[in-house]
């Protein structure tokens, strides 16, 4: 195959790969936030502690998306 066409195909596949890698953290953030709201409804006095834990969980989930983004830039060059 022509090297230019091969490079374009590789770039497009990497873009799709990053999109798929972002799905997992998106689902994870939704689950964490939903379960936190559910827990706050059950025990309102724990809301502050639950909120802090929720933000930590969201941060760890989003770290996966950032790793996926970094991987995209590493492998497309």
UniProtKB/Swiss-Prot annotation:
UniProt keywords, alphabetically: ATP synthesis, Cell membrane, CF(0), Hydrogen ion transport, Ion transport, Lipid-binding, Membrane, Transmembrane, Transmembrane helix, Transport
Coiled coil: none
Membrane topology: Multi-pass membrane protein
InterPro entries in alphabetical order: ATP_synth_csu_bac/chlpt, ATP_synth_F0_csu, ATP_synth_F0_csu_DDCD_BS, ATP_synth_F0_csu_sf, ATPase_proteolipid_c-like_dom, F/V-ATP_Csub_sf
Pfam families named in the record: ATP-synt_C
Subcellular location: Cell membrane
GO molecular function: lipid binding; proton-transporting ATP synthase activity, rotational mechanism
Residues annotated as transmembrane: 13-33, 55-75
One cellular component term from this protein's GO annotations in UniProt: proton-transporting two-sector ATPase complex, proton-transporting domain
Broad class of the protein's primary localization: membrane
Subunit structure: F-type ATPases have 2 components, F(1) - the catalytic core - and F(0) - the membrane proton channel. F(1) has five subunits: alpha(3), beta(3), gamma(1), delta(1), epsilon(1). F(0) has three main subunits: a(1), b(2) and c(10-14). The alpha and beta chains form an alternating ring which encloses part of the gamma chain. F(1) is attached to F(0) by a central stalk formed by the gamma and epsilon chains, while a peripheral stalk is formed by the delta and b chains.
Family the UniProt entry places it in: Belongs to the ATPase C chain family.
Function: F(1)F(0) ATP synthase produces ATP from ADP in the presence of a proton or sodium gradient. F-type ATPases consist of two structural domains, F(1) containing the extramembraneous catalytic core and F(0) containing the membrane proton channel, linked together by a central stalk and a peripheral stalk. During catalysis, ATP synthesis in the catalytic domain of F(1) is coupled via a rotary mechanism of the central stalk subunits to proton translocation. Key component of the F(0) channel; it plays a direct role in translocation across the membrane. A homomeric c-ring of between 10-14 subunits forms the central stalk rotor element with the F(1) delta and epsilon subunits.
This protein's name: ATP synthase subunit c
Annotated source species: Clavibacter sepedonicus (Clavibacter michiganensis subsp. sepedonicus)
